[in-house]
Amino acid sequence: VPTRVNEYGAVTVVTTNDEIGGESLPLFKDKVDKLFEKGGHQLILDCSELPGVDSEGLEYLLDLQDQCEEHVGALKICGASEALATILRITRLDRRFEFFGDLDEAVKSFG
């Protein structure tokens, strides 16, 4: 299963082992958008298995972050590879997201 969802109380964790972008983006968006519609506004993207993100994928994550913030939530990122962290730093998107080394830290950050 490319994209998995786990609930930790009010926090929803999305883990994917498929690229966020290209041909796989519509399936990922569909799954996450359905979670959001059900009230999942406190989201964590677990990137520990993520092979990559393209520009469309980054744009979607920014849109999702904006939607979460509009509903007094947030999209937080954990387990980002060095390559992903570098991409986010270069594009200055690292300023838009909170990053955590592991899932426990990210879940606890929602209080």
PLM ranges: what are they?
Residues 106-110:
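Short, charged, intrinsically disordered terminal tails
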Residues 19-97:
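Amphipathic alpha-helical interaction surfaces in cytosolic regulatory modules
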Residues 12, 20, 104:
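Residue-level detector of flexible, active-site-proximal loop/helix-junction positions
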Residues 82, 104-105:
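Acidic phosphotransfer microenvironment of two-component signaling modules
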Residues 1-15:
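Short beta-strand/loop segment at the start of cytosolic alpha/beta domains
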Residues 98-102:
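Short acidic-hydrophobic, aromatic-tinged amphipathic segments that line or gate anion-handling sites
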